[in-house]
Amino acid sequence: SSRAINILKNVFLIACEDTRQTKKIMNKFGIKNNLISFNKNNSFKKTPSLIDELMDGKSIAVVSDAGMPSICDPGEDLVCKARSLGVDIICIPGPCAAIAALVSSGMPSSKFIFEGFLPKKQSDRKRILLEISNNEKTTILFESPQRLIKLLRELKEFCGGEREIQVSREITKKFEEHIGNNINEVLEFFEGKIILGEITIAVSYTHLTLPTTEYV
């Protein structure tokens, strides 16, 4: 957006997930500014120095490679610390894969649950998969292409093969696609294929009537 371009031109510093990717955008729009790498591998070390710059009255833009900073991307800890110190935070809305996948799925969107990437620890992973199987709201997940088949098989085990699902790939990019119907059919579609790109998954709510708890 024109607002985002103006921000990138005028801030003191741009903290970006990958300087090479951000430079492509800057070159396209004729933006010249200072860049530093700020990603999951170095954000813990770099946050204190960025906070110092902010406390000196300087402005910093945080840019991720894809999607929205802080949503399974660097930025959350920096924003939290900056806000606690009274620094003004402005979010420039941009592409958000979770919302795009939810809207394009046609599943109920007035209430939904965002889980991001499931944990690798099996006990935690199984607990969340069980929660997803019983959710009465649409669930949105992120997954890497290398682990998509594993996750689809787990969802089939916990939710059943007939549960409605949509796998969205490369949202907003050239090869964007949305594959959906039920878990069985989506799993069959992807098995045996080379899967590339950013993956976002929408899982429909359970159609079972769950027992309710009354509080007196």
Feature annotation, model-predicted:
Residues 55-115:
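Short glycine-cluster motifs
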Residues 8-14, 87-89, 137-139:
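Short active-site oxyanion
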Residues 207-216:
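Single conserved hydrophobic/aromatic residue that forms the stacking wall/gate
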Residues 42-50:
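Glycine-rich, highly charged phosphate/nucleotide-binding loops
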Residues 16, 91-94, 141, 167:
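General beta-strand structural signal in soluble alpha/beta enzymes
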Residues 58, 138, 142-208:
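A contiguous loop/helix-start segment that scaffolds small-molecule binding in enzyme catalytic cores
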Residues 1-40:
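Glycine-rich, flexible N-terminal cofactor/catalytic loop recognition
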Residues 115-134:
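A short, charged helix-loop
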